[in-house]
Amino acid sequence: MIAELLHWLATPISGASDHAIAMPLAWHGRLMVLAMGLLTPPLIIVARFFKVTPQQDWPRQLDNPFWFITHRRWGHIVGAIVAVAMAFVLAGRGWESPLHNVHTAAGWLVVLLVLVQLIGSWLRGTHGGPVDPFTRKPRPAALWPGDHYSMTRRRIIFEYMHKGAGYLLLVLTVLALCTGLIAADAPRWMPVALGAWWIMMAAVFVSLQRAGRCIDTYQAIWGLNPDLPGNRRRPIGFGIVRRPITNVSPRERASEK
């Protein structure tokens, strides 16, 4: 029974007797699976559910940088891996029209959205607020205005685009990976293992969402004061937890640092 199962897992998806693929295309597939199939789901989970960490005394302790540093650093790593993966496929096959087939179309859309995410993050505007995000020291009130703290139009557009593109990227990633595995006639253990990983990530997502861990970014950073610009408007996105507001001023928050 075990031997038969192992044989089935090692057999290509089509049932062919062997699996052969050109080396550049093999590395293209491996790197795209690593970047988009394995690394991207936990990065989204960290960004969505760990703006406040489990041991953090929130809202007394605000602006935990863990989620942002992790999301930004690993997001750039994912972008670099995708770039190398695309270099391999161009070296192996040369240029093909994005409309060549479903996999090619989905793959180029994934690359485009990765670029949108990276470029958008560079253009998101200034931070603002009563505490300098780099030195962690209080700032005078004259320096508080910023795109994020003041929720300017620039910041609002960024949030809609960044979050919307992120979830669209997930859908297209599933399509690109599935069609890529079929096109490569990959051994069956690959879609089985990748599917198990995504099911586990989906279970973690649902569990954290039901636990109320998707805390509003603005409140996670600047607290519950009802007078703050971001607390006077609805959060952008779905399933976001907005805690009851309290009368703690941003000046008091800055003085606690």
Set out the residue ranges of the language-model regions.
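Membrane-embedded alpha-helical bundles that constitute the cytochrome b-like, heme-associated redox core
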Residues: I2-K257
